[in-house]
From Swiss-Prot:
It is an enzyme of class 2 (transferase). This is 8-amino-7-oxononanoate synthase. It comes from Anaeromyxobacter dehalogenans (strain 2CP-1 / ATCC BAA-258). Catalyzes the decarboxylative condensation of pimeloyl-[acyl-carrier protein] and L-alanine to produce 8-amino-7-oxononanoate (AON), [acyl-carrier protein], and carbon dioxide. The keyword rRNA processing does not apply. The lineage of its organism: Bacteria, Pseudomonadati, Myxococcota, Myxococcia, Myxococcales.
């Protein structure tokens, strides 16, 4: 029975509908992959973060199944109570070695890590400097820390330098995505590391969309740019390129020891399920032994980038498997997604507040499980639907 106290929700949902901003769930099946079943139809999946195609890899699945039989389906408690099982420590050691750090700590999700770690490092007398296009979880974590939140223009090192020079904060924390999830471009980590060294600031890098994809060993953008030792807090996820679930922070041992006591999402959450840890360990082995996956992925990326540029989209700054097809209005993005679906392509419309107003888009994401024919087919389908979209202003990246 509906309760009167919730009657206001109907008007809120109608307002979201009117603005083209109402979200809805859309089940896929039977498993994550380059082609999925959606609404009874087989569609090419271009909106997953499964960048290496490992979510359904038989070795990753088998590792998860074996761990479920050996250690159970769930951990049963927080790590600090009775939930610290062998797969947790094994995965943390492997992640620390992969990132070239002394230690690592697992979190329930990337959102958990970003929401909790800043508050363990800074507080009321401190300041956090955050790229204006950082992920929502970073923004929320900065706000929860109660430090002063200073947002600098996207990748604007010059503006950040001035802000750091003027601050009188006790502690300073610079936070950035490595790869920005809605634009696919890369943070200027070398320059940010230089600024942090100069001003005595801590550098926190979210490698969610870079770990597994970039760098000689797939360890992320910091590895690719040779600045791993200059990043204080390496955050990454297990549910994107690694195809599993969860997140981690890697860094100096003293940092990890502090987070064990002060990172509230770690302290007050049930530990990651053992099958998720085992799946991530198996995925890390694939990353280490099959660099050809990354080579193939970036060959597809070059093909997609060239094709989108020919269609007039600004993708010159893209440095990842993420391509923003910016269409402007919510109506155009929704119409494009619907038209592409009719032609066999599954790509979702991304709208405010996820992206700024006026930059609604299709977020196209490639996987090593895709092939060149699928890239070419999508580009042809996109070219065919563009003329029939509602009118809008010039296309520009967000």
């Amino acid at each position: 029975m509906a309760r009167g106290a919730l009657d206001w929700i109907g008007a809120e949902l109608e307002a979201l509908d009117a603005k083209g901003l109402r979200r809805s769930l859309e089940p896929i099946g039977p498993a994550q992959g380059p082609v999925v079943q959606v609404g009874g139809r087989a569609l090419v999946n271009l909106c997953s973060n499964d960048y290496l195609g490992l979510a359904a890899d038989p070795r990753v699945r088998a590792a998860a199944a074996d761990a479920a039989m050996r250690f159970g389906a769930g951990s049963g408690a927080a790590r600090l109570v009775a939930g610290d099982l062998p797969p947790h420590g094994a995965l943390e050691a492997r992640l620390a070695a992969w990132k070239g750090r002394e230690a690592a700590l697992l979190f329930g999700s990337g959102y958990h890590a970003n929401a909790g770690v800043p508050g363990a490092l800074v507080g009321r007398d401190d300041a956090v400097f955050s790229d204006v296009l950082n992920h929502a979880s970073i923004v929320d974590g900065c706000l929860l820390s109660r430090a002063e939140l200073v947002r600098y223009r996207h990748c604007d090192v010059e503006e950040l330098a001035g802000l750091l020079a003027r601050t009188r904060a006790r502690r300073k924390l610079v936070v950035t995505d490595a790869i920005f999830s809605m634009d696919g471009d890369a943070a200027p980590l070398r320059e940010l590391a230089e600024l942090c060294d100069r001003h005595g600031a801590m550098l926190y890098v979210d490698e969610a969309h870079a770990a597994g994809v970039l760098g000689p060993n797939g360890a992320g953008l910091a590895e690719a740019l040779g600045v791993q030792d200059r990043v204080d807090v390496h955050m990454g996820t297990l549910g994107k390129a690694l195809g599993a679930f969860g997140a981690y922070v890697a860094g100096e041992r003293r940092l990890i020891e502090l987070l064990v006591s002060r990172a509230r999402p770690f302290v007050f959450s049930t530990a990651l399920p053992p099958p998720a840890c085992a799946a991530a360990l198996a995925a890390l082995e694939v990353v280490a032994t099959e660099p050809s996956r990354r080579t193939h992925l970036f060959a597809l990326c070059a093909r997609m980038q060239a094709g989108l540029a020919r269609l007039g989209f600004d993708v010159a700054r893209v440095a990842s498997p993420i391509f923003p097809v910016v269409l402007g209005t919510e109506a155009r993005a929704l119409a494009a997604a619907a038209a592409l679906r009719e032609r066999g392509w599954f790509v979702r419309a991304i709208r405010p507040p996820t992206v700024p107003h006026g930059t609604s888009r299709l977020r196209v994401a490639l996987s090593a499980a895709h092939d060149a024919a699928q890239v070419d087919g999508f580009l042809a389908a996109l070219a065919a639907v563009l003329p029939d979209l509602p009118p809008a202003g010039p296309r520009r990246a967000g």
